[in-house]
Amino acid sequence: AGASGLALSPDGKTLYVSDLGSRCVWAVPADARELTAGGKNCTAFLTGLPGYPGALAADEDGTLYISYRWARSSWLEKNADSTLLRGVALRAGQNLQEKLFGLPTQSPCAEAVSTADGSWTRALFARKAGGVTAVCPVESKVYFGTADAQRLPSANV
C-alpha cells in the first residue's frame, strides 16, 4: 500500500502522510531527509480510520481534510481471507469497481480534523454513490475530485 496522500501544515513544519496499508495518517517533520512510516521521528497522527485514507489537504487554519478510498472496508476485511482477493489482479470495469469500492449514498466521503489537537471537526457525506479521489480546500469551500464527476463538487466549510 504505502503513502497515498500528502499535506503540509500551514506553518510548513509538519508533513502529513496518509498510509493505505496501516489505515492511518502519519505526522513527520517536513525537514526530515529520509522517512519511513512508523520510523524515527514519525508519529501516528490519526489511527483507526473508518476507510482507507487517500488524498490529504490542509487549509490555512490547520484543518486536515482526508478523502477515503475503498470506504467499504468492512466488505474488504470480511472477504480478505477468501480466494477472491488472493487471485491474479485483473482489470475491472468502472461498474465493477464502483460496486466493490464505491461509497454508498450518505456515507462519509471525506472528513476534516484539527491538526492542533486531532479532534474531528466535520464529516462530509456522499450525495450519491461514488468515491472521492482528491480534496482541496480553497477559502471557505472544499472541492472534491471524483473519477466519475462531470463537475467538481464542493462543500462550504
Task: Identify the meaning behind each predicted range.
Residues V132-V157:
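Blade-level signature of beta-propeller repeat domains, shared across WD40, Kelch, NHL, RCC1
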